């Protein structure tokens, strides 16, 4: 379904894979990219992959959207998880690409029901594991 403001469509597979991550925990993360006029799934991370694996898949010079299922233990020793939405927009990416991703982000995020934390990052330090942990608690 295209968005009148950005003209961007969201491929059904994006929503289906997100539901599998959320409900079945089939994936640790999903990386999405804009391909022409639609958002598509680029990479599915297996449950065994960790945060470093995830960040290594993000291209250094191109924007991406991603969701990451972060498991953590609270101060009370309770196991929890939170689903992060990450808008990756490196400083080195093209201005036009950054504009397209920025204008489509909210519309795309609304398609993924169950996002608990949103994070925007322009370089790896803005989405370090320490930042993810602090935002989860």
UniProtKB/Swiss-Prot annotation:
| Positions of modified residues (Phosphoserine) | 6
Q: Which UniProt keywords apply?
A: Actin-binding, Cytoplasm, Cytoskeleton, Phosphoprotein
Query: ADF-H domain: which residues?
Result: 7-137
Q: What does this protein do?
A: Actin-depolymerizing protein. Severs actin filaments (F-actin) and binds to actin monomers.
User: Where in the body, by tissue, does this protein show up?
Assistant: Specifically expressed in pollen.
| Compartments where located | Cytoplasm, Cytoskeleton
Cellular-component GO terms for this entry: actin filament; apoplast; cytoplasm
Q: What is the lineage of its organism?
A: Eukaryota, Viridiplantae, Streptophyta, Embryophyta, Tracheophyta
UniProt main location, coarse = cytoplasm
Q: Which PROSITE patterns does the entry mention?
A: ADF_H
**Which InterPro entries does this UniProt record tie to the protein?**
ADF-H, ADF-H/Gelsolin-like_dom_sf, ADF/Cofilin
Return the protein name: Actin-depolymerizing factor 12
GO molecular-function terms, A-Z: actin binding
Gene Ontology biological-process entries: actin filament depolymerization; pollen tube growth
Query: Does the record's keyword annotation contain Phosphoprotein?
Result: yes
Q: Which domain of life is it from?
A: Eukaryota
UniProt keyword Phosphoprotein present: yes
The family this protein is said to belong to: Belongs to the actin-binding proteins ADF family.
Q: What Pfam families does its record include?
A: Cofilin_ADF
């Amino acid at each position: 379904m295209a968005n009148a403001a950005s003209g961007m469509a969201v491929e059904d597979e994006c929503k289906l894979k997100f539901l599998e991550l959320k409900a079945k925990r089939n994936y640790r993360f999903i990386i999405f990219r804009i391909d022409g006029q639609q958002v598509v799934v680029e990479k599915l991370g297996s449950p065994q992959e960790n945060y470093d694996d995830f960040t290594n898949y993000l291209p250094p010079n191109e924007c991406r959207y991603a969701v990451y299922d972060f498991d953590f233990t609270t101060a009370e020793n309770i196991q929890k998880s939170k689903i992060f939405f990450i808008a990756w927009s490196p400083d080195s990416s093209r201005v036009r690409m950054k504009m397209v991703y920025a204008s489509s982000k909210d519309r795309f995020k609304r398609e993924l029901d169950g996002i608990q934390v949103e994070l925007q990052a322009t370089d790896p330090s803005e989405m370090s594991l320490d930042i993810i942990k602090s935002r989860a608690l």
